[in-house]
Regions:
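C-terminal single-pass membrane-anchor helix
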Residues: 142-171
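A structural signal for short, hydrophobic/glycine-enriched beta-strand patches
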Residues: 1-138
């Protein structure tokens, strides 16, 4: 989602990674970071690989503290594949994850995590102000697509008074 610039994370993705490092350091550097993201058709490396390089080379995270999930193509796959890694690592033990994403994307990510049974807290990194309009539209479309009926009902309920108002000028 946040993409790459060549083989490096975009500023949007780097902000997510920086927030993840902040949490990791705040937690005593005990957790494992899962860098999650596949390789797009126009990308030279997977997002996960680029993320790990950034974390290790730019942020000084030990290589063995970062695991790769490099098969996913969207948010739901990121979460499912990462959950499978966490489930395998924990055995039958309970765990709680922090899912770091951009602040505009936390609601949908947390909703997906809940849907697949992933005990996780959504944590948002800051998004540049210029990107907010695009991000808002993208998330609105994604959330409304996932909840078609409630959004359709709300739209119709909104449309009725608008139609009546418009009709008052025509009649």
């Amino acid at each position: 989602g946040a993409g790459l610039s060549g083989t490096k994370p975009t500023p949007l993705l780097a902000a997510r990674l920086d927030k993840g490092v902040e949490l990791w350091e705040g937690g005593g550097r005990k957790a494992v970071i899962i860098a999650s993201g596949g390789r797009g058709s126009d990308e030279q490396v997977s997002e996960a690989e680029a993320m790990k390089r950034y974390l290790v080379e730019e942020r000084g995270v030990p290589s063995d503290a970062v695991m790769l999930e490099d098969r996913s193509a969207n948010t739901m796959e990121n979460l499912r594949n990462s959950k499978a890694i966490m489930d395998a690592r924990s055995g039958a033990g309970a765990y709680r994850a922090a899912v770091v994403t951009s602040d505009y994307h936390v609601f949908r990510t947390a909703e997906y995590a809940h849907k697949i049974g992933l005990a996780a807290d959504g944590v948002g990194s800051k998004t540049a102000r210029y990107y907010w309009p695009t991000a808002f539209i993208r998330e609105y479309v994604a959330v409304s697509n996932a909840h078609r009926w409630p959004f359709a009902v709300i739209f119709v309920l909104w449309l009725i008074p608008v139609a009546l108002w418009f009709a008052s000028f025509v009649l």
